[in-house]
UniProtKB/Swiss-Prot annotation:
CDD domains assigned to the protein according to its UniProt record, in alphabetical order: GT28_MurG
A GO cellular component entry from the record: plasma membrane
Species of origin: Rippkaea orientalis (strain PCC 8801 / RF-1)
Primary gene name: murG
Protein name according to UniProt: UDP-N-acetylglucosamine--N-acetylmuramyl-(pentapeptide) pyrophosphoryl-undecaprenol N-acetylglucosamine transferase
Similarity remark: Belongs to the glycosyltransferase 28 family. MurG subfamily.
Length: 351
């Protein structure tokens, strides 16, 4: 039996593509590498053996703190090497983030293959630094290759989980014949977007819309507005059903979410997270805006009035939503997970 180590941690954007790949490798023994007390503890659960190492990113100007982080990284590299040896791992797959550094370098130290998936249009620091040490870098956006001239890249888009490919019933009391707005802040929520949206909700409800607002778990005002047609939820595990049913999404622009919007053909208003590393969400969103699959607004320029009217204008012009939906579907790559699985299989066979 082939053995794969998946290193994916922290956010849905890192975890969901890795889970989608794992679904397409049913005959593999999969070990999962994460970080203590992160989202993988919930999402991976007992589906795969979960191993944790204590690593973090270099995000401080303190020399002492950076030395401590460097020590953790070096220790993590040897912990990964030990994990690879004791579990007879054939290939390492990672979706980036700081867990990727010990995973990639540990694979090199152990003498096995490493595959990195970069979902964002602008590659992260770890990807730029370590892509040359990977046997292949799979890309979520074709245009990303220009930023990784020394890497062996292949464009596969970003995989999504299997429920997105089949109709999923929405288990919320929402009639079929009413417009539905889905507000998505990503796996960690988006308080700034939440605050904007709550000021717009009364007018959207007055226009006859229902609203499912995924607030995240850290919004202290999440339950301040009540209405029978407004559903404020910290997290919703039937994202496929929600996006398939939604007439319009108001969303951040993480690569995983954008891929899900494309697969489901959901028109969107995108508000990139302004503090994302390298402003990568803005670049992700621009691809969708250029394709006329989404409307793009920068958070610094967005007022409640602008957002309110943008949504109302979309609801008043269903032909616009229909056109945006078609353009979103044209961006979808339906076999992304299978392409990644084939890539992994190829490296196992030559190991």
């Amino acid at each position: 039996m082939a053995r794969l180590l998946i290193a994916a941690s922290g956010t849905g954007g890192h975890l969901f593509p890795a889970l989608a790949l794992a679904e397409h490798l049913p005959d593999y023994q999969i070990e999962w590498l994460g970080v203590p007390d992160r989202l993988e503890q919930t999402l991976v659960g007992d589906r795969y053996p979960l191993h944790s190492i204590a690593v973090e990113g270099f995000q401080t100007r303190s020399v002492l703190k950076n030395l401590q982080i460097l020590f953790k990284l070096i220790r993590g590299i040897f912990e990964v090497r030990h994990l690879i040896k004791t579990h007879h791992i054939d290939v390492v797959f990672t979706t980036g983030g700081y867990i990727a550094a010990p995973a990639i370098l540990g694979a090199r130290l152990a003498g096995i293959r490493a595959i990195l998936h970069e979902s964002n249009f602008i590659p992260g620091k770890v990807t730029r630094l370590l892509s040359r040490f990977c046997d292949r870098v799979a890309l979520g956006f074709a245009g990303t290759a220009q930023y990784l001239p020394k890497a062996k890249t292949v464009w596969v888009s970003t995989p999504v989980r299997s429920p997105f490919y089949t109709p999923q019933p929405l288990d919320l009391p929402i009639p079929e014949n009413v417009p539905l707005i889905a507000v998505i802040g990503g796996s960690q929520g988006a308080i700034a977007v939440n605050q904007l949206v709550r000021q717009c909700v009364p007018s959207w409800l007055a226009a006859g819309a229902y609203i499912v607002h995924l607030t995240g778990k850290n919004d202290p005002e999440a339950e301040t507005f009540k209405h029978p047609h407004y559903f404020a939820l910290p997290f919703y595990d039937n994202m496929a059903g929600l996006l398939q049913r939604a007439n319009l999404a108001v969303s951040r622009a993480g690569a995983g979410t954008l891929t899900e919007l494309a697969i489901t053909g959901t028109p969107s208003i995108l508000i990139p997270y302004p503090f994302a590393a390298e402003d990568h969400q803005a670049y992700n969103a621009q691809v969708f805006a250029d394709a006329q699959a989404a409307l793009l607004y920068r958070q610094a320029e967005l007022t409640p009035e602008i957002l309110e009217n943008a949504v109302l204008n979309c609801l008043k012009h269903p032909e616009t939503l229909e056109s945006m939906a078609k353009q979103a579907q044209r961006l979808a790559v339906l076999d992304s997970a299978q392409q990644l699985a084939t890539l992994v299989n190829g490296f196992v066979q030559v190991t």
